[in-house]
A protein has these predicted regions:
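Extracytoplasmic
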Residues: 11-45, 246-251
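Extracytoplasmic gate region of multi-pass secondary transporters
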Residues: 30-31, 226-280, 342, 346
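Helix-breaking motifs and short loop linkers at transmembrane-helix boundaries and internal kinks
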Residues: 42, 74, 89, 95-101, ...
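Conserved MFS/SLC helix-loop-helix module at the cytosolic interface between two early adjacent transmembrane helices
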Residues: 61-97
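Structural signature of the two symmetry-related core transmembrane helices
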Residues: 77-91, 298-315, 396
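Cytoplasmic helix-loop-helix junction between adjacent transmembrane helices
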Residues: 105-144
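Helix-loop-helix hairpin linking two adjacent transmembrane segments in secondary transporters
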Residues: 143-193
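C-terminal transmembrane helical hairpin of 12-TM major facilitator-type secondary transporters
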Residues: 297-344
Length: 425
């Protein structure tokens, strides 16, 4: 009788979903206690926006190094260290009162979260088949944007029961517990895991998209000769610029434009809830399209382009209504579109990078987080001088640029064809 294949790899996809939930709850909670923090610490809007910018600076600077470290030391060690590190600095955020120190803490918090996505890319390259990578990547992404769905509910409950500082203490403790669990259950390769039977191991090893299990140094000179290496970074700059703007400023927008109070702020979770569902759906659809024999450009690029177009159209309608619920509907649809594009970005990064997926995804996420670094501060300045409507409408311009870039990403042409040689230009 043919041995039935185990599905241990999907257990790890679920684990990454929960890691994503924790990471983005830790990131998003600060936006729901913005007023309390600004009042207690005497911060202006631009100063508060700098907290997110310092996080993004630390996060961005460590993207490429963390991807290379994940390739060298394995995602098991990197994820464990990352969870403990960022959870410790989450806890410290609630303890610091000095402006300069809290900026430093948020910078180091960003350093700690940096290895999460590149390590996931390395893990997926070795644990999943070519056709499964889009769906596997969507698990962490879906968790990341289910985090903001839970964040307002949990944050508001903690603040009502204790104070805003307790939010950081409790969230940080959960992250440390997750680090312990991950260290116990995870292995870098399916060949190393005793729960993976021979049928699953054989399926993975025959169908994964890597050129060799042995690691070698990334051929940076060859990478820099390919415009697809720049294109995937530019479009992801746009993705994270837009997402971070809404992650930080959406609650404040709803308060100032629609007079939503703190107790009603859970409505701001709806855009992230739709993003969660669309990320999962896009990953599944992308895998199905590949299974039908279509190109990776169709399975990744066309879906990503559709996501940006949905965002651009939705944002126009979102700012031209005086009705809170209509605005939330269009904002939800728009952010859902960006979520689709984000999911395809990570799938395409593993397509391009293959066994250097940690490096390529780290490069992509570096530029994404440069966008995230400047977005909160720039948005704070634009809102003060131009207002919310014009600030949101201006986001259509980078969305159009991102659409153009996707025609140059070319996920069907990987950067690596052997262990030490990049493909010709």
């Amino acid at each position: 009788m043919k041995e039935k294949r185990t599905n241990v790899r999907w257990m790890f996809a679920l684990a990454f979903f929960f890691i994503g939930v924790i990471a983005y709850m830790d990131r998003a909670n600060i936006s729901y206690i913005a007023k309390q923090m600004m009042d207690d610490l005497g911060m202006t809007k631009p100063q508060f926006g700098l907290l997110a910018s310092f996080f993004s600076l630390g996060y961005a600077l460590m993207q490429v190094p963390s991807g290379m470290l994940a390739e060298k030391f394995g995602p098991r060690k990197m994820i464990t260290i990352a969870l403990v590190w960022w959870s410790a600095f989450t806890i410290l955020t609630g303890m610091i009162k000095n402006h300069g120190l809290i900026y430093l803490v948020r910078f180091l918090f960003g350093v700690g979260e940096a290895p999460m996505y590149p390590s996931n890319a390395v893990f997926n390259s070795f644990w999943f088949s070519k056709n499964e990578k889009g769906r596997a990547s969507s698990a962490l992404l879906a968790g990341s944007y289910f985090g903001p769905v839970l964040a307002p509910i949990v944050t508001i409950a903690i603040v009502n029961a204790f104070n805003w500082q307790a939010v950081f203490y409790i969230f940080g403790a959960v992250g440390i517990l997750m680090a312990v669990l991950w260290a116990i259950i995870a292995k870098d390769l399916p060949e190393q895991h005793r729960m993976v039977n021979e049928a699953e191991k054989r399926f993975i090893m025959e169908n994964r998209d890597i050129v060799a299990t042995e690691k070698s140094s990334p051929p940076w000179n060859d990478f820099f000769k390919r415009f697809s290496f720049y294109a995937i970074a530019i479009q992801y700059f746009v993705v994270q610029f837009i997402i971070t703007l809404f992650l930080i400023w959406l609650p404040t927008y709803l308060t100032e434009v629609f007079h939503v109070n703190f107790k009603e702020m859970s409505i701001s979770s709806l855009p992230w809830l739709l993003m969660f569902f669309l990320i999962l759906s896009a990953g599944a659809i992308s895998g199905r399209v590949l299974g039908l024999g279509r190109s990776k450009f169709v399975a990744r690029g066309v879906i990503a382009i559709a996501g940006f177009i949905v965002f651009a159209v939705s944002i126009i309608f979102a700012v031209r209504t005086g009705n809170l619920y209509v605005s939330i509907f269009w904002l939800s649809l728009g952010l859902g579109g960006i979520g689709i594009s984000m999911g395809m970005s990570w799938a395409a990064a593993t397509d391009l990078g293959r066994n250097f997926s940690g490096t390529v995804s780290g490069w992509m996420n570096l530029w994404g987080n440069i966008g995230a670094l400047i977005s909160p501060l720039l948005a704070g300045l634009f809102v003060e001088h131009l207002g919310w409507t014009m600030t949101f409408q201006l986001l259509i311009v980078p969305a159009v640029i991102a659409v153009i870039m996707w025609f140059y990403v070319k996920p069907d042409q990987p950067l690596i064809v052997s262990d030490d040689k990049a493909i010709e230009k």
